[in-house]
Amino acid sequence: MAIKKPYRVLLYYMYTTIENPEEFAAEHLQFCNSLELKGRILVAKEGINGTASGTTEQTEKYMEAMKNDPRFAGIVFKVDEADGHAFKKMHVRPRSELVTLRLEDDINPKELTGKYLEPKEFYEAMQQEETIVIDARNDYEYDLGHFRGAIKPEIKSFRELPNWIKENKEVLEGKKILTYCTGGIRCEKFSGWLVREGFEDVSQLHGGIVTYGKDPEVQGELWDGQCYVFDERIAVPVNQKEHVIVGRDHFTNEPCERYVNCANPECNKQILCSEENEAKYLRACSHECRVHPRNRYVKEHELTEEQVAAALEKIEAENQVKLG
């Protein structure tokens, strides 16, 4: 029997009415700090969306307190074991929206949302004819892992998704639409918006990718790569039956599942790259970012101007060989 790890990472959300998000956020931060949790929780009039880490005892106390609050009756926690905290600090912040769609006429998932499919139902539906699977996440999340055959909307943020759908409406019309995201919260609104836009057969993966990966029956099957998560783990496994790497190194296009942020603080783009290429390319996504005066990789490793110049010269020489 596997030894259980001492920490837990909680992922949860609930659409429910919170009358005063600012006041609730301040009080909730105090409560989380009293339990010594770390994480990021968003609070809005429409509900709560959070991920937090702590010891087994700390997270149990938190879940119990939340479930005992009438506003959060029926809340579902997705729980991962961990060796330590998944966050450095604890943040609880009030927001106008739990997920940023910025629609002129907002969607209330309690009134309008797509049909919920449990993991086994979603697994079967993906394989049916005339079905289109849409990834409701951002492009860098898709690049690390996704359901086999899923469409990748070329978007940098969730609020760009409705426009992408409108631009590609002719491809989607008349099809069965399945959509999914990490934990389910984005699809609650997105699938509701699709229904309102006139798409008739819209379903969503209940509980998201995280729930799908833990399901004892499907065991994450038909998922390729890993699931991007917004904490220090960055990636978590999903498919328990096989591991297919779909991520590609930014510089060499070789299989890669290691994300870093571009060392230019004004860019900060997330790129997949090996440790070797991180060093070789000064953790920068482009030449402009490599020579940026505030390149963090250069500062962290205290590289001299001569060392930087030598690295740039080597890259340029290799590029010339490729072109030649």
Curated annotation (Swiss-Prot):
Domain Rhodanese: residue ranges: 127-221
PROSITE patterns per UniProt: RHODANESE_3
Example GO molecular function: oxidoreductase activity, acting on paired donors, with incorporation or reduction of molecular oxygen
Residues the record marks as active site: 181 (cysteine persulfide intermediate)
Keywords: Oxidoreductase, tRNA processing
Catalytic activity: uridine(34) in tRNA + AH2 + O2 = 5-hydroxyuridine(34) in tRNA + A + H2O
EC number: 1.14.-.-
Recorded coiled-coil stretches: none
GO terms (BP aspect): tRNA modification
Similarity remark: Belongs to the TrhO family.
Function: Catalyzes oxygen-dependent 5-hydroxyuridine (ho5U) modification at position 34 in tRNAs.
Protein name: tRNA uridine(34) hydroxylase
Organism, scientific name: Bacillus cytotoxicus (strain DSM 22905 / CIP 110041 / 391-98 / NVH 391-98)
